[in-house]
Amino acid sequence: MRPVHKRNNRADTPAITAFAITSPMTSPVLAFYRGTGTDAAGPRIAQIWAWDHRRLEMVYDFIQWLFPLADPSRFNPDAPLLTTADIAAFYADPALQEDARRSLDLMLAFLGLRRGGATVTRGNEFPKLAAGWLEPANHNHLRLTRMLLFLSQIDLQAEARGLLACLEDIAGHEGAGKIQLRTLEFWRAAVPTAV
C-alpha cells in the first residue's frame, strides 16, 4: 500500500501522515538490504556495491533501492516504498545502518567525495568526477536529494548533515552557478537541523 500524503510548509515537500505497515519479514527494502532479495532488475545489493562508476551513471533504477523513500518514485514505479516498519528496523539494527553507510560510500565515491565518520569531504578524484555531475539540473542532484532524505529517515542524520555541509561548500566554490538555488533548497529541506 502507498502512504497517505499531506502537504507541509517545508519547500512544498510531502509530509507522510500514515503508512501501510509492512512486516519486516516481507519488506522488499529489508530483504534487499539483508542480501536475501533483489531489486526489480535482479541484482542483489552486494552486486550493486561492486559496480563501477560507468554503470552507476548509466543505470537509473538502482538508486531507489539503495535509498528508498516513502513517496513513490516518478521515475521507477517498481521501486519499493520505505515503511515505518523498515525505518524502525534501520533504527534498531546496526548492521542495516552499516549497510546504508556502505551504500552512501559507494555513491560518494562515484561523485568524487569521501566520508570519515559523519564528515563528508572532497576526495582525490573530485576534480575529475565532479565534471560528470557538477552542472545545472544534472540527474545526480535528484539522487543526492534522495540520499539525504533516506539518511535523515533511518537515524543517520549526522551523515546527512555531513553530506549537506559538503554540498553547500561545493555550491559556494566549484559549483557556483552550476548548482541551482532550488536544488540547494531541496537538499536543505531534506536534512533536519541538529537539535
Regions found by a protein language model. Give the residues of each.
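Enriched - but not universal
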Residues: 4, 52-54, 68, 136, ...
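Intrinsic-disorder-associated, low-complexity terminal segments enriched in Asp/Asn/His/Tyr and depleted
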Residues: 5-12
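N-terminal leader regions that mediate targeting or early regulatory function
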Residues: 19-124, 158
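Alpha-helical bundle/repeat cores within regulatory domains of eukaryotic proteins
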Residues: 120-195
